[in-house]
Regions:
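Short, solvent-exposed loop/turn and secondary-structure capping segments
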Residues: 34-37, 63-65, 105-107
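Short, conserved sequence motifs used for protein processing/export or organelle targeting and
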Residues: 67-87, 100-227
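Local sequence-structure signature of Cys/Sec-based thiol-disulfide redox active-site neighborhoods
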Residues: 13-54
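Thiol-based oxidoreductase modules, predominantly thioredoxin-like and allied folds used
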Residues: 48-74, 88
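Ligand-binding face of N-terminal immunoglobulin V-set domains in extracellular IgSF glycoproteins
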Residues: 94
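Extracytoplasmic
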Residues: 17-19, 46-49, 89-91, 146, ...
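Boundary at the C-terminal end of the N-terminal hydrophobic targeting segment
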Residues: 2-9
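Solvent-exposed loop/turn segments at secondary-structure junctions
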Residues: 27-31, 56-61, 100-103
């Protein structure tokens, strides 16, 4: 996998393009998620890929409350389920660039989705920060139904959590790029628009920020800004 990392970060003419966004929906209470967690751990070190771990809360009833889960993360996965006309929610699930998904963590399958997204991606509208307090999304082609602007704050370090109850009782779960905050900044209709960024709170220390411009209701990723 590492051998293709640099190639992924470059377009057909050798210039650097935006990263492919890989989202993992997982749970510390999911007995089948260890391989997916490990895969994202590896992808987090690759150039040309923004790997994000979203902890869902709907497995908490099994006896262990996921320490990173939030209902808005489950709602994001639900939007993908509806957009892609899937039969139900499942973990682990990997969504690549908002375009394609894979239930499970079969490495070759995920690699294929990433490579396809790399071939198909475009840089999209320009995203830029102004005085670290505002985001400006430039003009561009508006997708049918419009688009949403999302702020994602995630922990780039590895987190090891020992599960004390449920199916994974006694196991230590290692997770990377765990999303801690997901905020919808507003809609985008194709014209240049400015958005106010939420201020960094005490819980934001050590977190990285990504801005995702995404077709509405769980659509494809149009542009990405990282800081």
């Amino acid at each position: 996998m590492a051998g293709t990392a640099e190639a992924r970060s470059r377009g057909p003419h050798g210039h650097h393009e935006r990263p492919v966004v890989v989202e993992l929906f997982t749970s510390q209470g999911c007995s089948a998620c260890a391989a997916a967690d490990k895969l994202v751990d590896q992808l987090a070190d690759e150039n040309g890929v923004l790997a994000l771990t979203f902890a869902v809360d709907y497995w908490d009833y099994l006896g262990w409350n996921d320490t990173f889960a939030k209902p808005e993360f489950s709602a994001r996965q639900k939007a993908y389920e509806q957009r892609m006309a899937l039969r139900d929610l499942s973990t682990p699930q990997i969504v690549v660039d908002g375009r394609s998904q894979l239930a499970g963590a079969e490495t070759k399958g995920v690699e294929a989705l990433i490579e396809r997204a790399q071939r198909d991606r475009s840089d999209g509208p320009r995203l830029r920060l102004v005085r670290r307090s505002h985001l400006v999304v430039g003009p561009g082609a508006r997708p049918a139904g419009g688009a949403d602007v999302w702020l994602v704050r995630y922990d780039p370090s590895a987190r090891n959590v020992t599960v004390k109850r449920g199916d994974n009782r006694g196991q230590t779960i290692r997770e990377r790029n765990v999303v801690r905050q997901l905020v919808r900044l507003g809609s985008w209709t194709g014209r240049e628009k400015s958005y106010v960024l939420p201020t960094d709170g005490p819980d934001s220390a050590g977190l990285k920020t990504a801005i995702l411009l995404q077709a509405a209701k769980g659509g494809r990723i149009l542009a990405v800004l990282q800081r």
